[in-house]
Amino acid sequence: MIKLKPVIYISISFIFIFFTNFIYAAEFSWKFNNGLPETRNESKELDRFADDVKNATNGGLNIKIYHGGSLGLKNNDVLRWLPTGAAEMGLVWANYLGRDAPALNAVYIQGSVGSSDEHIKAIPVLKDIYSAELKKWGIVPSGFMGLPILYASIFCKGEPVNSIEKLRTKKLRVWSKDMVDTFKRLGVSAQIIGQTEMYVALKTGVVDCAVYPALYAHTVSLHEVTNSASYLYPIAGLPYVLGASEKKWEKLPESYKNAVKSAAEELFQRSTDYTDDEANEIEARRKLESQGVDWLVDFSASDQRAFLDAAAETWKEAANDAGGDALNNRARILKAIGR
């Protein structure tokens, strides 16, 4: 039997390790599409999530977060590009899915809940619904990221607005179809404009006002293009889904899948700590005032009720139109929040 010299063993071993590591690195370097601005706290949390996965896999799975839609992949197209693996992972938010998945879009609309307590009760049901629905699209819900308790305010330039009557004379920016429908019921003209285009739309007069939470107004420099704001309703803060392309996910070793799920669960726990949310909202409003935004008295109780009533009609209609599981999903959420 011919014996290989030790140097040959070493050379062969080195070549094997080099080759397998090359394949390994190429297969598990993933892109994550995040449509939110890099300055948002959620974006910072996603960076931390990616670091946690990298550390847990000893660098074997490297997830690079691309913020602000820098990959050129649009939020409302996520059900089209994510299953193909154009990016292996992406942030999925049901509010953007109205065109391709009306049943998902109808799960939980703006105005679905009337308080933060109701919203917190709805979250476990929402997670179950999204997990089941996204799997039908070839998307693995590897985890979730919660939103803080947010408060939707109407930011306007020019004439101060803190009543629905005045809002009827303005052009309003919103972010989802259900909001267009709800405001239409109130006689308000609203149009969908992405947050990356919102600043220019306000500056150039495409719209006069925008629905946005005070907590995040600084991330899109709203104080530069508006001069007043007033609170209208509690935001139905749908949890974001950390979606993964199923065909890419299946190529991961189980240990890596578990690392992603574990890091995602830690992210969800951090993002659903609501202890300081009310204080943060107050501080955000004060900061905006210091930057020149006049914080007005809230919309009246009757206006707030009118918005929630209009939203309830929109939600019911959207569920009926969507068909399938939409009505059952709505019933599950109503039961969870005690209605």
Predicted regions and their residues:
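Bacterial N-terminal signal peptides that target proteins for export
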Residues: 1-12
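Sec/Tat signal peptide C-region and signal peptidase I cleavage site
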Residues: 18-25
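N-terminal secretory/targeting leader peptides
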Residues: 25-118, 134-137, 141-339
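Signature of the catalytic double-stranded beta-helix
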Residues: 120-133
